[in-house]
Every structure is written in C-alpha cells, then in structure tokens.
Design a protein with these regions (language model features):
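A structural detector for beta-sheet-dominated domains
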Residues: 7-9, 31, 55-57
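A short, structured loop/turn motif at beta-sheet edges
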Residues: 1-4, 30-34
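A short, exposed loop/beta-hairpin motif centered on an aromatic-Gly-Thr core
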Residues: 20-32
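Short aromatic-glycine-(Arg/Gly/Cys) micro-motifs in beta-strand/loop hairpins
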Residues: 1-22
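Short, mixed-charge low-complexity intrinsically disordered segments
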Residues: 45-59
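Low-complexity, intrinsically disordered Gly/Pro/Thr-rich segments
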Residues: 35-43
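Generic "edge-of-domain/loop-turn" microfeature
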Residues: 13-15, 33-35, 59
Length: 59
C-alpha cells in the first residue's frame, strides 16, 4: 500500500441554493493511484460534491 496526496477541487450547493467552490488536500492510502482517486471520488460524491477534479502524487 502507498500513500497519495490528492489535490482536490470541487463545487457544492449551499443550503441557500448558491454554488460554491472549494480546494483542499487529502491523503489516501491505496494499492495504486487509480484506486486512491476512486476511493476519494466515491466519498466526495456521497457527500454531495460535484465537478470533482483530482490531481494525485505519490508521497
């Protein structure tokens, strides 16, 4: 298993109905980069984020 640093850009809709953007860094442990991105993307979709862009590097 390897650790990946994933830079994430997403949009989401607030309770007031406006669309906001956010940028953050997550650390994910996975077998490979594709799995790391898949795990994080699934988590973010479940949380209601849209327009998910992920850039990963191995750390």
């Amino acid at each position: 298993m390897k650790e990946y640093e994933i830079h994430t850009t997403v949009t989401y809709t607030t309770d007031g109905g406006t669309t906001e953007g956010s940028y953050f860094v997550e650390y994910v442990t996975a077998k490979n980069m594709a799995e790391a991105k898949h795990l994080l993307r699934s988590e973010l979709k479940t949380a209601g984020y849209k327009n998910i862009r992920l850039d990963a590097i191995e750390v």
